[in-house]
Every structure is written in C-alpha cells, then in structure tokens.
C-alpha cells in the first residue's frame, strides 16, 4: 500500500508471475465504491488525500499521507475524524480486492508499503470488509470468505490463530486416514521490514 496498490503472490516459496507476468496485479481489479474505476483509485496515497478532501470540503492537495496520519493521531491540525475515515476507507477498498484474491489463492496476507505505517487505521476497514456477508437470490447468506479472518497484530487474535483444531479422519471402507482442517483460517499481518528490505 503506497503510491499505488500492488501485490505479490507466493505459492510454495515461489513468486507467482503468471503466463504473462501479471500474477498479483490487484491494482486493476474492480473498485468496490466506483465500479467503473480500478481498485488503485481507492487504495493509494492519492486516495487517502482525495477522501480526506471530500470529507472536509477543504483543499488537501498539499497534504501527504503522513500529514493526514498526524491529523488522525491528533498531533497536527485538521479534522481528526475525517483523517481516520480516509485510512479506514482505504482499508475497506483494499479488503474487497484481498477477498477476491483469497478466494483463488488461499493463504496468509502481509500488508506492507509506505502507507502501511497507518495500519491501525487501515486494518479495521480491511477486517470489517473481510468479515461481511454476501447472499443469494433465494435469501441465503454466506461469509464472503470461507475462512475465519484473524488480525495477527492483536495478541489475542494471534494466539487463537495458532490454536490447532485439525484432526485425522478415517476414509470409509479403508484403514487410511487423511488430514481434515476443521477450522479454516486466514491471518492478516503487517510487515515491519519496509519495502526496501522486503524486496
């Protein structure tokens, strides 16, 4: 999360590049709030600035995400509630794209990039989005992910994530047993390395 919205998909310790080098291209996914726009328009530095400006009605073109973060923290002048909501909306829009990726690639999510420093304001939006329900025309309701989502930045959630609830199940008419994941789960973590060291 930074100037733009990017992702790297790692499967069995190998970076997914895809047949055309487009593996992990989340930036071009559909934007939840503006379906005619790309996701990156709501998940980027410019998105934080735009949303803050929309919420306050004041020109924010000279503000950086760090400025808006400081406003959210209450250490700089400005609309604190609008600043928090600006990062929260980025989280919601990122969460929508992450859901789509996770329904194909089932694995841990690590958030990084320049804007990830505001994770405490972004993660609630991501978590709320990833825990929402979707439905059918018949009226049935399903979680948008088959897995329970854990914010690994929170100790209690981290400890629960580590709990093993899997078991071995006997195959009918056989002596063989197979591993059964009783508890489907996904963890969301925030990188502490920074983009330069991570790459």
Specify the residue positions occupied by each region the protein language model found:
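ATP-binding/phosphotransfer module of carbohydrate and carboxylate kinases, centering on a glycine-rich
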Residues: 31-199
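Glycine-rich phosphate-binding loop of actin/hexokinase-like ATP-binding domains
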Residues: 1-46, 162
